[in-house]
Amino acid sequence: MDTRGRFLTERLRIKTPKHRGPKKVVPALVELVKPLKGYDHVSIGFPGYVRDGKVFTAPNLSTKHWAGFPLARVIERKLGKPTRLNNDADVQGLAVIKGKGLELVCTLGTGFGTAWFRDGELMPHMELAHIPIHHQADFDGYIGEAERRKIGDKAWKKRVKKIIPILATVMNYDHLYLGGGNSSRLDFKLPKNVTLVSNDAGMEGSAFVWHPKGPRKLANV
């Protein structure tokens, strides 16, 4: 990506290793980026609670294996480039927010990711995913990918439609952005202050982690 979040190469993908701890995932990441040349910085968007370059939780990978792992430092050493580690929803938010008022970014994928911004500044470490929403289920369990496969798209979309006014009441956002791989499944009418965003924003936002201007600049927080 360039500094404006524009793709300079095709998007590369690999399957998540069967063993989802760092011993398998880190080598897979290093192998993935081998074809890429001429980059200056590395940005990692991680699905969990991260701080100061370390992983603290990884509910959809394996917190047991990831807790306390210094992912930013390890990748920086292996690739030889300055590396920053942030929550994946936070990184996606950097690409889509307008920088005005209270903006909430939610990602619908394997789990439920959230990022919160005030006038363009990130309010980090917010994990709405683990708040109970229905009986004993949290947001992850209520509208995550495993549940979507279990109950089907029709019932899953009804659940997503149900939580939007709940989020509006609890967070009082000025604007809500819905992204992640499953957001493209939504086909019902959304409120005027709710916008569907491309899943590519998760990568586009990585450029703004290193962007030199404005409140969007983000280090390891």
What residues fall within each predicted segment?
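A polyampholytic, Gly/Pro-enriched intrinsically disordered region
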Residues: 103-107, 147-151, 213-221
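A short, acidic, amphipathic alpha-helical segment used as a generic capping/interface helix at domain edges
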Residues: 156-169
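Short glycine-rich, Thr/Ser-proximal phosphate-binding strand/loop in the N-terminal lobe
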Residues: 1-24, 121-150
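Anionic-ligand binding region
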Residues: 101-104, 108-133
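Short secondary-structure boundary segments
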Residues: 46, 108-110, 180-181
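Glycine-rich phosphate-binding loop and adjoining helix at the ATP-binding site
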Residues: 10-43, 49-102, 141-142, 191-212
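Short beta-strand scaffold segments in enzyme catalytic cores
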Residues: 1-2, 48, 94, 112-117
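Glycine-rich phosphate-binding loops at beta-strand->alpha-helix junctions
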Residues: 167-199
